[in-house]
A protein has these predicted regions:
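TPR alpha-solenoid repeat register
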Residues: 62, 110-111, 117, 158, ...
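Short coil turns that delineate tetratricopeptide repeat
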Residues: 57, 106, 153, 186-187, ...
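Canonical tetratricopeptide repeat
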Residues: 66, 73, 80, 117-120, ...
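Register position in tetratricopeptide repeats
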Residues: 38, 76, 80, 87, ...
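Canonical positions in the second alpha-helix
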Residues: 52, 101, 147-148, 181-182, ...
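TPR-repeat structural position
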Residues: 42-43, 91, 138, 172, ...
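N-terminal leader/linker segments that initiate helical-solenoid repeat arrays
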Residues: 2, 6, 13, 17-83, ...
């Protein structure tokens, strides 16, 4: 019986000694992580804390303190390493690391780090998309800005830049929809300007192609986003080509109202006068011929017509 007690005591002593050895080993691993962290070797520190955590959890109650400390360091280090990836423009790996950080931080009860990592993801996606746009890789830029908007649907800047990328890629209709989204999310001034420019360029191209009816239609869409002298000029020229002189007069007059000092104002006035003269409206014809008498090319003829109409 005495021999049995001695054997049991030896076993218990051995277990206690092994436990002490395990705790010492885990503590040493944790301390190695702390030393690496002080030396700003984040990857080595992270690995040490992970190993220390795994060992501490096997120790149960004895390892709780070290495990708790490891859990406080690991998400913060993951986040810091992810931010370094962002600085190195390693955007895809950065996003993956940030997502891993969020999961770990939530698991370990670090809500602040989880929130910070989540807030950073749209910014990283934006940087990636911006880099693609600057490189004129419009397909990648479009994908990038769509990813930003998936994470942050109310991001007006992302919608605005998505519109720019789509417009540069030649997808005008989709660009307009993106600009409308931007306008609804704080970027109205710039978005409206971009939409107006798209319609204006379309109108000019249609006028050049002699597609006069659609040129008028596109030009008038410009003015839905703010009156534009050039749009009225295109609408007027297209209407004149369609022999819709009343419309041409109306649009030319709006052009002169918005751009009274334009370089071609006297020439436009001469055209309006001639159109009124064709309609038999002498008073209006004289009014606009008088605005054209200073024109170097048409001034003499304008004066001649005034004299004839009086």
């Amino acid at each position: 019986m005495k021999k049995l007690f001695i054997t049991i005591a030896a076993i218990l002593l051995g277990a206690s000694f092994a436990s002490a050895q395990d705790l010492a080993s885990v503590t040493e691993t944790f301390n190695n992580g702390a030393i690496a962290l002080q030396a700003d070797n984040k990857a080595e520190a992270l690995q040490s804390f992970r190993e220390a955590l795994a060992g501490a959890e096997l120790l149960g109650a004895e390892g709780e303190e070290i495990a708790s400390k490891c859990k406080s360091y690991i998400p913060v280090l993951e986040f810091s390493i992810a931010k370094e990836m962002v600085n190195n423009q390693d955007y895809d790996n950065a996003v993956a690391a940030l997502k891993a950080t969020i999961d770990l931080a939530k698991e370990y009860g670090d809500s602040a780090t989880a929130e910070s990592a989540a807030d950073l993801i749209p910014q990283v996606l934006m940087q990636k998309a911006n880099a693609a746009l600057s490189a004129k890789d419009y397909e990648a830029a479009v994908a990038g800005y769509n990813a930003v908007l998936e994470a942050d649907p109310n991001n007006g800047v992302a919608a605005l830049r998505l519109g720019s990328a789509l417009n540069s890629a030649g997808d005008k209709d989709a660009a307009i929809e993106a600009f409308k989204m931007a306008a609804a999310n704080g970027q109205e001034k710039q978005a409206v300007k971009q939409i107006s420019n798209i319609y204006l360029k379309n109108a000019a191209a249609l006028l050049k192609a002699k597609d006069y009816a659609n040129a008028v239609s596109e030009a008038l869409k410009v003015n839905e986003y703010g009156e534009n002298a050039k749009a009225y000029q295109i609408a007027a020229q297209a209407s004149q080509s369609l022999k819709k002189n009343a419309d041409a007069i109306k649009y030319f007059e709006k052009y002169l109202e918005l751009a009274p000092n334009a370089g071609n104002a006297t020439q436009i006035a001469y055209t309006v006068a001639a159109l009124y003269q064709q309609q038999g409206n002498k008073a209006k014809a004289i009014e606009f011929y008088q605005k054209a008498i200073t024109d170097p090319k048409f001034g003499a003829e304008a004066q001649k017509q005034i004299n004839a109409l009086k």
